[in-house]
Amino acid sequence: MGVIARQSIKGAIANYIGVAIGFYVSFFILTRYLTQEEIGLTRVMVDAAVLFSSLASLGSNASIVRFFPWFRDGGRHHGIFGWSLLLPLAGFSLFALIFLIFKAPLLEAYSVNAPLLADYFHLVPMLTFFALYVTVFETNASVLMRITVPKLVREVGIRLFNLAAYLLYGYRLISLDLFVCLFCGSYALAMLLNLFYLLKINRFDFSIFRIDRRFLTRDRVREVLRYTLFMTAAVLAGNIPLFNSLFLGAKAGLALTGVYTIASYVANVVEVPYRSLGAISRPVIAAAVKEERWDEVSRLARQVSLHQLLVSLLIFTLIWINIDALFTVIPNGADYAAGGVVVFVLGLAKVVNSSLSIATDVLNYSRLYSRSLLFIALLTAAAIGFNQLLIPRMGIGGAAAATLCAYGLYFALLLAYLHLRLRVSIFSAAQLKVLTLIALMLLLGEAWSRWLTPLLGLHVLLDAALKTLLLAALALWGVYSWRISQSVNDLLKKFVRAQ
């Protein structure tokens, strides 16, 4: 647990540095120098690449986490890293073939409302390859408990590389064509940096491709292959929000997708802690599931879920009470203010996913992992159906609502299934305390905006800062005095003693 805590903290620091950079870039660079259509273009390209790379991985990223404890023997890993490199390559080759076959109908779907995307659609396979191996190398580092540097590359490095491309294009030093190439190249650079890091810590050499047959009995090979194939579908669960921008681009055009993009950047801040803690907690959950210690699995799952709920809801609340101030200060904010509803609804969806996704990990690492296909099929069908239904009626708000509805249906059924079959539950009384505290904060935030803001007459930024500080202090007091989390209380006590 000490390693988990240290790596979690370092990963969180990397995440929040990335969030700070991403916040500045998204709200003060993109909105100033790129049109809504150009913002939508970059978003659709990245979301398409991430979705396609998730499928092309053929479940290898999840399988290395699940089966790493089986292959680990002291400092040796008996070829599992070679498996994790070769399987995605096979998956990408299959994806490239399918892309060539269906390229024409895909282009036709975007030709009316998003003609700019058609000009750069040929770069999507290349971007998919880069995104695929950024994740592959990061997963390899994760199971070795060396996640900090890959997190820095993903959360900070890519954003800085993109910032350079935005500024070069914003000052018209490069053409749009070169800008898009540099934008894609940032993922290539991130992929190479992650590879060099693994080489530096002496985890990669040609011996990784020699799989020790003593560790691959016929039954185990069958289990690994079956699990990997099932996880090819299961990875869709984490990428449901990507459907939103893809559907919006085709049905509403890149300009509205650009507005949705800026709003979703705000909502994405909610799940930053999930990315860090999730990457470190999954190997621990996998080890407990492997030994079928279900009481321990429930304890770990409750702990992870509680802290994810607490942190994600606190971040969501502090964002929402300042949403009007945010759209007031960003360049061309009036053009993007319509995205406020997206921030609220998609933010709630991020809270649901962050706090409950540990249930997906438990199912995927258990002997019942094949059942995940049914749940993923349900989630995918729900996401597509809700997008088709709600986007024509509600626009960008419909895209956000589609994600929330799909997640709500998915997790309700999944949690019931885990409780019935494995007796695993992630709920605790402390979560009710969190919800009560957040409701109180939202009420006080609304009261402040209605009565104190006009009364005080402060500058919008000063008013937002004062409101945030006071409500954050109230939240800390509530967490401590209500004893929501013993771990958080211990951290607060240590912080007070250190002062």
Task: Specify the residue positions occupied by each region the protein language model found.
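Membrane-interface junctions at transmembrane-helix termini in multi-pass inner-membrane proteins
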Residues: 5, 130-156, 347-378, 418-420
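Transmembrane helical elements of multi-pass membrane transporters/channels
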Residues: 7-23, 158, 182-198, 202, ...
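Helix-loop junctions and terminal segments of transmembrane helices
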Residues: 27, 57-73, 143, 263-305, ...
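Interfacial segments at transmembrane-helix termini and the short loops linking adjacent helices
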Residues: 36, 103-124, 320-350, 357
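Hydrophobic alpha-helical transmembrane segments
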Residues: 152-204, 264, 377-384, 388, ...
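Membrane-proximal transmembrane or re-entrant/amphipathic helices at the cytosolic face
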Residues: 446-499
